[in-house]
Design a protein with these regions (language model features):
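Nucleotide-state-sensitive switch-loop elements of NTP-binding domains
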Residues: 2-8, 13, 17-132
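Contiguous mid-protein beta-loop-alpha structural module that forms a pocket-lining wall or clamp
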Residues: 119, 136-147
Length: 147
């Protein structure tokens, strides 16, 4: 059964640094697929991680937890069927609610051979106040649902 781990956090919080560290230490020897969700035409870290031998499925047209829930489920199913990974890491855009990403995974996990394993939020403590003020509920939700 494929384990699914969600690594969330706002832009610049250190998600990619955390993921790279986990890939080289905690997940060494596992077949890992990274699903990253970035706004814009090109995912920010795709090229770097591909060079590390990590399969990446980039979804650039919206937030996993918002407009792509249907496409997200299809993408997740395709990844499991095509790669049969030990683990899938999901790095959602930092502009959504972690609770919605968790729900999106739980909604499809029974249809595929996968299980939600963990959900983590990376936070830059030097920016907590400004993020809390500017992003309110979205920022609070990511911290509240990290587990």
């Amino acid at each position: 059964m494929t384990k699914i781990d969600i690594i969330s956090g706002f832009l610049g919080a250190g998600k990619t640094t955390f993921i790279k560290k986990m890939l080289t230490e905690a997940f060494a020897g596992e077949q890992v697929v990274l699903i990253e969700n970035e706004f814009g035409e090109i995912g920010i870290y795709g090229g770097f991680l591909k060079e590390s031998g990590i399969e990446i499925r980039e979804m650039n047209s919206g937030c996993i937890c918002c407009s792509l829930v249907g496409d997200f489920g299809k993408s997740l199913k395709e990844v499991v069927e095509k790669y049969h990974p030990d683990r899938i890491l999901i790095e959602p855009s930092g502009v959504g609610k972690l609770s919605d990403v968790i729900k999106a995974v739980r909604d499809v996990q029974d249809e595929i051979d996968a299980k939600l394993n963990s959900f983590t939020t990376v936070v830059d403590v030097t920016k907590c106040r400004i993020y809390s003020k500017n992003f309110g509920e979205f920022f609070s939700n990511q911290i509240e649902y990290a587990g």
